[in-house]
Amino acid sequence: RHEIENMEPQFKDIRIGNPLLYTVEDYEKVVDVLSAEYKGNNSTLFVGHGTYTPATACYAMLDYMLKDKGFSQMHIGTIEGYPSFETVLRRLKSDQNNQVTLVPFMFVAGDHAVNDIDTEWKSALEKEGFRVNTNLRGLGEIPMIQDLFIEHARFACNYKMVKILDKKKRYANEGN
């Protein structure tokens, strides 16, 4: 959003849709989608790209919500940031299930899915004694995830995000 704000004067109007995980309701919908798409008796590890910024907290929140909804054998890990491979490895060991399915938590299952998930993470888990399957289907291939993005785009078309400082200025001026 900050990058686009610099370009705003050059356009009549710019709208930016929200990311997949923005509201608590978004997280709940994604938990419902993941649990419906990847149900089973084995552990499932969704691997996101991650980041070293505070935005990485969204992965931990999603992991927490999966567990809170009763999906204790579904885990979220990240290539960069938290939850790290080491964090997820401890959780997988506590599942007492030696079969794991790796799934990219990425819109497109591209280079990271092949190089990091299907190669590095799979190999590291196999060295720890796990039998590992991979499902390299990107989130963008799931119709219910597509619907969430469409919902966010429609919302952005109909409602303009108001910056908090602009909102506070308006409130201050109304009080005068």
Q: Where are the model-predicted features located?
A:
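Extended amphipathic ligand-handling, pore-lining, and cofactor/metal-binding catalytic surfaces
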Residues: 1-176
